[in-house]
């Protein structure tokens, strides 16, 4: 997710949304300016950046001086909560019949021949895979037993659910018709 719009004072501007762009240039008089991200959405947070603009030596080729301002943000706790909700929804569907046959469920529960299929613990939290990652993970434990003669008692099956935020072509969080984020949710790696 990136910041595509910002304001300085009463003026709002857009940045080039092309990921291959080397940036967008703006001209400012000398002074200290606060660049404030705008229109970041409900699930993304970004802090303002103060940047001094100095009068000074100019670039030989462009006859201008330049400074770089980087506006960065992060997914917020509200998105993490929505990711947890999506993880719990899939986990709960994986202990229903025929929901357990879904390819997004853990392989161990994808069977039509289970005499026991129970949820011992659903994810209670999710964590982001790393700074800037679009993926959250959570842990679940299922209790399963095959109806074959070999499996004499239920056993626990631990599984990791992966919740990946879907982004639109502009790099923004994709939202459904209710304004909620859209995720790709599945168990496994």
Question: Which residues are covered by each model-predicted region?
Answer:
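Short loop/turn and low-complexity linker motifs enriched in small/turn-promoting residues
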Residues: 1-189
């Amino acid at each position: 997710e990136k910041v595509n719009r910002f304001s300085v004072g009463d003026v709002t501007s857009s940045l080039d949304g092309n990921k291959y762009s080397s940036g967008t240039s703006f001209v400012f008089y000398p002074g200290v300016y606060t660049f404030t991200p705008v229109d970041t959405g409900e699930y993304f947070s970004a802090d303002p950046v103060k940047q001094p603009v100095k009068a000074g030596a100019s670039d030989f080729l462009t006859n201008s001086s330049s400074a770089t301002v980087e506006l960065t943000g992060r997914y917020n706790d509200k998105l993490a909560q929505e990711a947890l909700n999506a993880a719990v929804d899939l986990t709960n569907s994986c202990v229903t019949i025929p929901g357990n046959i879904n390819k997004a469920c853990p392989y161990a529960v994808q069977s039509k021949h289970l005499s026991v299929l129970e949820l011992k613990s659903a994810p209670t939290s999710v964590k982001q895979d790393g700074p800037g990652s679009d993926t959250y993970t959570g842990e679940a434990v299922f209790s399963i037993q095959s109806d074959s003669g070999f499996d004499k008692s239920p056993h626990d099956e631990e599984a990791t659910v992966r919740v990946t935020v879907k982004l639109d072509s502009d790099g923004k969080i994709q939202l459904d018709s209710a304004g909620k984020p859209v995720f790709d949710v599945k168990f496994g790696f």
